[in-house]
Every structure is written in structure tokens, then in C-alpha cells.
Amino acid sequence: MARIAGVDIPRDKRVVVSLTYIYGIGNTTAKKVLANVGVSEDVRVRDLTNEQTDAIRAEIDKLKVEGDLRREVNLNIKRLMEIGSYRGIRHRRGLPTRGQNTKNNARTRKGPTKTVAGKKK
């Protein structure tokens, strides 16, 4: 396992796929990083030389990934909640923030159903 940005990336997979194990790096970013470094996308991690690994590390260090990115996202959500914006209120209540209907669905965001007692006869 190679260690990049504090994450052990799998050795047996292609470099493009392995880089996506790092939080904040998706397919597109992984391809851009490899293009900047000059490494083929088809190479397996175990076949990388130390120089290539160091170059990839240096390129990824320029990006905001892992802990820094998670912290920034959490601070953005906290800021929205503090200023009392609509999105912040939706975050606080645990509801969808992007305009989806909540009458029937939104179970992922709302959690399991809370059963309400029926009317007694």
C-alpha cells in the first residue's frame, strides 16, 4: 500500500482508481493530477517508481483534500446555520437542502419513520 495524503491507496488497482480513495479526489481530478505529473492512467500502483510517487504526492499536496477539505465543508455548513439562511435551517432540521419535496420521500435525510399512535375508538 502506497501512502498518499495520509491514505493507504490499494497497490493492485490502476493509479486513477487508487487516487479516488482520497477524500476530495474524484475521477476527473485524478486524471488531471496524472496528466500534470506525466504518468499513464493504466499503470498499477505497484509498478510506480519512487520518483513518480513523490511527484504525485507533490501534486496532491497543492490540492485541498482529506482533513482540510472536510473541515472546510463542516465550517461552511456551520456558517450557514449561524447566519440563519434557508439552507442553514434545513441543515439544522435534518431535511433536504436543495429543494426536494418532503411530503412522501426524503427518508435518507429524515431517518427512519417515526410511528404515530392511531386514534382510539
Curated annotation (Swiss-Prot):
PROSITE patterns for this protein: RIBOSOMAL_S13_1 (PS00646), RIBOSOMAL_S13_2 (PS50159)
Compositionally biased tracts (Basic residues): 106-121
SUPFAM superfamilies according to UniProt: S13-like H2TH domain
Record keywords, A-Z: Ribonucleoprotein, Ribosomal protein, RNA-binding, rRNA-binding, tRNA-binding
Region (Disordered): 90-121
Cysteines joined through disulfide linkages: none
Assembly: Part of the 30S ribosomal subunit. Forms a loose heterodimer with protein S19. Forms two bridges to the 50S subunit in the 70S ribosome.
Full protein name: Small ribosomal subunit protein uS13
